[in-house]
Structure formats: C-alpha cells, structure tokens
C-alpha cells in the first residue's frame, strides 16, 4: 500500500527551524543531505517525517519555485511500490511533472495545484539519531 512518508516545509533558516522542532515537539533528526540546489533535513515524530528544505541563495529552479517564494508548505511525498507505473498514471491523468527528466524523487502538480512527490519504497529510513521523540501525555 502506498503511504505518505513526509511533509516538506520550505524554510529560510535550516538550523533555527530544526532547533524549534527538536525543542518544542521532540522530533529526532533522521538525516541531512545536499541535493542539487538545496539542503534537505528530515526530522521525525516516529511515524511521519517533516522534511525541512533550504534552497541555495539565488536558486530559480522549477522545483524551488513550485510552491511559491518564501517559506511555505512545499510538497508532500508518497512512497510507491513501482515508480514507473505511478509516474505513468500521473502523466495519464494530465498532471504537470515539475522534476527534470530522470530525477528521483519525481515532483508533480496534482489536480488543484498541490505539489506532490513520489518516492520509491524504502527511500526514507527511520532515525539513526540518539534522541527519541517525546511521548505524548494527557497533562493539562
């Protein structure tokens, strides 16, 4: 079954935003990597990731501008069993492919304008970090 694996936030300050999600919500860092024109840092609550995306200064790529300028919810990603079949179905339904040809993951604009991404199953792993997400309590 396909599943949502992360929600991506486009941010201006990667370190400050990371500190916020760690301190306020107890999210653990999964990984940080430099990808083409941006740095992507995945944090998790143990179930779903929040991907913080910081684009390089002056970047004007289609992906960087897809959700608009400045900080915003950039996209959500769905893990799929078969990338070729999923991409073919997306194209068949008339969705605009935003990513350059051959780039994985594949970003696209869904009906209604939302930017989405498909990723191969297992691309995003769970945390290697020592810290664990805080358990929710019912304290008032």
In which residue ranges do the predicted regions lie?
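N-terminal beta-strand motif that seeds the catalytic metal site of vicinal oxygen chelate
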Residues: 1-18, 73-78, 122-140
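Residue-level signature for short turns and capping positions that connect secondary-structure elements
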Residues: 48, 57, 121-123
């Amino acid at each position: 079954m396909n599943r949502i694996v992360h929600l991506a936030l486009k941010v201006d300050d990667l370190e400050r935003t990371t500190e916020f999600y760690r301190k306020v919500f107890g999210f653990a860092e999964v990984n940080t990597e430099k990808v083409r024109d941006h740095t992507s840092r995945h944090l998790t609550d143990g179930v779903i990731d929040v991907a913080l995306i910081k684009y390089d200064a002056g970047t004007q790529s289609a992906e960087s501008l897809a959700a608009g300028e400045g900080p915003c919810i950039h996209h959500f990603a769905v893990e799929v069993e078969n990338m070729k079949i999923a991409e073919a179905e997306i194209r068949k339904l008339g969705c605009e492919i935003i990513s350059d040809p051959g780039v994985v993951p594949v970003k696209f604009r869904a009906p209604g304008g939302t930017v989405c991404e498909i990723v191969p199953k297992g691309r995003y792993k769970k945390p290697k970090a020592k810290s664990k997400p805080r358990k929710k309590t019912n304290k008032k």
